[in-house]
């Protein structure tokens, strides 16, 4: 058996040199892999989130997004452009039964208008496998397929045991950041929203909002028989125009969305338990008012007005109080 004790681990000095800013380095523009409405949504060494309530239409948008990698044109303004020498794309489906999984593959074919998908598309159904096993399979696949530039993980909650555990959520986000950097890939993942507050689920949701390059918000309008996808958070570009799809006898078609405007959220709509959890996460030490407001915006991907409203609620309910230095702390 190979002696792994001889593997060299970089010293702190070596790590500092490796991580140091390189003034002559210019990022390759080809690193941008996913654009929606012409806006930069996903680039290599990043991960993005397709979010929404269960049965809100996430799979339809994601399937059409995947299909855009196989055709020279965009689909519903979404376009995946794979690097010339790394044209492999892979889907790990952690949720679907056999029936839904194979229907999903057929859906991707229909969106791409192809009878057969190219051999540089790989897909795995891992519904019956455990969290650790799925992660190891992902890592092994990436080791064996260095020409893979896009990895789709549907869904993220199956890669974690307790999505409300701070340590476990932190470890998962670190794992995502590590494999995207080491393997130079874009990860496209799916995360459910809570029905109570329309936020990404649990602590892992807070972490994903904070570290993802983009978080997309998908909603279903039963009254109008439409689905709407908008940008909740965009790190690398401005928001794209919402994409509205209407179901015409089982066929999704894009329709004009001039009348579709994202509704502004109110901090008062946030569930009390969720508000308390968020407060404890953010105000872990005495902080200035402006620091807390900035952190709320970062964690929730909401507006400055929303953050100030939430801070006002925390103060009025006695959840935080000002100390003798003028900083706020948990009461």
Where are these regions (language model features)?
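Phosphate-binding/switch region of NTP-binding enzymes
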Residues: 49-50, 60, 90, 170-254
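Generic structural signal for well-ordered alpha-helices
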Residues: 138-139, 173-176, 311
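The Walker A/P-loop phosphate-binding site
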Residues: 2-108
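Short, solvent-exposed loop/turn segments at secondary-structure junctions
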Residues: 43, 159-163, 193-200
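C-terminal regions of RecA-like/P-loop NTPase motor modules
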Residues: 3-12, 26, 144-147, 221-331
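Conserved inter-motif catalytic segment of the P-loop NTP-binding fold
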Residues: 53, 83-171
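Conserved catalytic network of the ASCE P-loop NTPase/AAA+ motor domain
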Residues: 42, 81-84, 143-145, 178-183, ...
């Amino acid at each position: 058996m190979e002696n792994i004790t001889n593997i060299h681990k970089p010293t702190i000095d070596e790590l500092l040199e490796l991580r140091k800013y390189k003034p002559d380095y210019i990022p390759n523009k080809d690193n941008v892999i996913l654009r929606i409405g012409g806006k930069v949504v996903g680039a290599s060494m990043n991960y993005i989130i397709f979010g929404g309530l269960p049965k809100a239409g996430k799979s339809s948008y994601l399937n059409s997004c995947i299909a855009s990698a196989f055709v020279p044109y965009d689909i519903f303004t979404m376009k995946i452009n794979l690097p010339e020498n790394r044209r492999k794309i892979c889907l790990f489906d952690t949720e679907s039964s056999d029936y839904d999984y194979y229907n999903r593959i057929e859906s991707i074919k229909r969106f791409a208008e192809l009878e057969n998908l190219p051999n540089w598309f790989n897909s795995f159904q891992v519904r019956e496998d455990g969290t650790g096993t799925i992660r190891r399979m992902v890592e092994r696949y990436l080791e064996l397929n260095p020409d893979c530039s896009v990895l789709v993980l549907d869904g993220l909650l199956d890669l974690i045991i307790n999505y409300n555990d701070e340590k476990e959520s932190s470890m998962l986000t670190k794992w995502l950041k590590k494999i995207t950097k080491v393997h130079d890939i874009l990860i496209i993942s799916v995360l459910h929203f809570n029905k109570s507050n329309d936020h990404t689920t649990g602590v892992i949701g807070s972490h994903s909002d904070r570290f993802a390059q983009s978080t997309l918000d998908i909603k279903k309008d039963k009254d109008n028989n439409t689905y709407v996808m908008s940008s909740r958070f965009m790190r690398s570009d401005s928001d794209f125009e919402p994409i509205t799809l209407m179901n015409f006898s089982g066929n999704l078609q894009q329709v004009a969305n001039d009348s579709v405007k994202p509704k502004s959220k109110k901090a008062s709509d946030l569930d009390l338990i969720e508000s308390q959890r968020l407060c404890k996460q953010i105000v872990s030490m005495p902080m200035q008012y402006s620091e807390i407001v900035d952190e709320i915006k970062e964690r929730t991907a909401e507006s400055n007005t929303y953050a100030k409203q939430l801070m006002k609620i925390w103060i009025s309910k006695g959840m935080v109080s000002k100390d003798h230095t003028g900083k706020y702390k948990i009461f």
